[in-house]
Design a protein with these regions (language model features):
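GIY-YIG nuclease catalytic motif and its immediate N-terminal context
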Residues: 1-49, 81-84, 88-91, 95
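Aromatic/basic micro-patches that form nucleic-acid/chromatin recognition or nuclease catalytic surfaces
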Residues: 42-45, 49, 54-113
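N-terminal intrinsically disordered, low-complexity tails enriched in polar/charged
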Residues: 1-6, 102, 113-114
Length: 114
């Protein structure tokens, strides 16, 4: 199965309203955006729709991240399209999700990832 990473821009109010998000991003100076980085076996667009609709799978598990459901604005393909050109396994996508999130933090973004 092919996996991809994706980036969602979050409303900036997540930084003031969510203490965990704020604590995870002490470097954030308010200049750049707040982002969520994830990985999926779906297309990024399908996954974003799942987040925004509070998708629950057949087993009854909620698959949407609360932070994206509440604060997610839109996908930022310019930040991830170049990574998804190469097919990734689940393990590779998990590693890439963390690398991308930490790289975006170093650039000055406030980032949430799992």
């Amino acid at each position: 199965m092919r996996y991809q990473v994706y980036v969602v821009e979050l409303a900036k109010r997540v930084f003031t309203e969510n203490a965990k998000f704020r604590a995870a991003n002490p470097q954030f100076n308010g200049v750049l955006e707040c982002l969520y980085v994830g990985m999926t076996s779906k297309t990024p667009k399908e996954r974003f729709t799942q987040h925004k609709t509070g998708y629950v799978n057949k087993k009854g598990h909620k698959l949407s991240a609360n932070i994206v459901q509440k604060y997610g604005s839109y996908l930022r393909p310019s930040l991830y399209d170049h990574i998804n050109l190469k097919a990734m396994t689940r393990q590779q996508a998990l590693i890439m999700e963390e690398r991308l999130a930490l790289d975006l933090r170093r650039q000055g973004y406030a980032v949430w990832f799992n």
